[in-house]
């Protein structure tokens, strides 16, 4: 369709996705992406050595980690008159917000499941019998990450809404916390980890992540406007692809819990 302004629709879709997804903030961005694959650079550094009068140089290089996109979802919707819609930015925004809210839920579920499966530290199931137990479980997870020498900065912990509810009953945590649109619990950290709440986190799981330990990327591969053959309307369809990978298993920790 000649009058379809792809850049306009794509920009609104991407902006609305970024407003509701935290993955881009808490993961390593890809070095490059093609239509079919995604590439991350993993840094390989030299060892620290004893000085005995001579210098032995080590190579510092990046090791590419390449994977095919294994998340692929599309939307295909009637929008009436595309040309008229393109003169109404509020209409396009409403469309983009609705589509990306659904897409972000699917992408988040996919990525968190991959991170949890690839966690290098898996703590035994925790029995939560009192509000304080949830806070303590998160502290313990952070301790395990510390034992693996995971950097203190850029640590996140992903929890479900039931876990956040337990935290709110704990005197050590803020009551009625401010949850941002992307799931970050504003201004709240436990054991140095920024709290992220998501309905798409693995069930009954506390997931600790260091930004440098996981990679994630997503893009809209196809976005088209067309006149529908079986309806008196125009249509817009798009294909979203994504890839998520654990780059350093030591930087990811997970524990399951049972609320009793």
Task: Show which residues each predicted segment covers.
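Intrinsic low-complexity, intrinsically disordered segments enriched in polar/basic residues
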Residues: 1-2, 117
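Alpha-helical scaffold segments that mediate packing/assembly in large oligomeric complexes
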Residues: 82-148, 255-260
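Residues immediately flanking
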Residues: 79-81, 161
């Amino acid at each position: 369709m000649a009058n379809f302004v792809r850049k306009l629709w794509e920009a609104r879709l991407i902006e609305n996705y970024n407003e509701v997804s935290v993955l881009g903030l808490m993961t390593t961005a890809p070095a490059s992406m093609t239509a079919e694959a995604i590439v991350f650079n993993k840094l390989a550094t030299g060892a620290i050595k004893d000085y005995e009068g001579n210098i032995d140089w080590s190579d510092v290089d990046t090791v590419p980690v390449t994977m095919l996109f294994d998340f692929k979802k599309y939307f295909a919707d009637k929008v009436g008159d595309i040309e008229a819609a393109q003169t109404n930015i509020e209409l396009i925004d409403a469309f983009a917000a609705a589509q990306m809210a659904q897409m972000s839920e699917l992408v988040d579920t996919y990525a968190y499941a991959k991170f949890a499966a690839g966690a290098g530290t898996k703590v035994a199931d925790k029995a939560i019998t009192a509000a304080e137990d949830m806070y303590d479980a998160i502290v313990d997870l952070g301790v395990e990450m510390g034992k693996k020498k995971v950097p203190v900065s850029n640590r996140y912990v992903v929890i479900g809404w039931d876990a956040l509810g337990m935290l709110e009953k704990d005197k050590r945590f803020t009551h009625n916390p401010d949850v941002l649109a992307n799931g970050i619990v504003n201004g709240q950290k436990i054991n140095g980890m920024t709290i992220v709440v998501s309905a798409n986190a693995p069930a009954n799981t506390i997931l600790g992540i260091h930004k440098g330990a996981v990679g994630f990327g997503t893009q809209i591969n196809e976005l088209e406007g067309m006149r529908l053959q079986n309806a008196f309307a125009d249509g817009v369809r798009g294909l979203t692809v994504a890839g998520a990978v654990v780059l350093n298993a030591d930087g990811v920790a997970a524990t399951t819990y049972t609320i009793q």
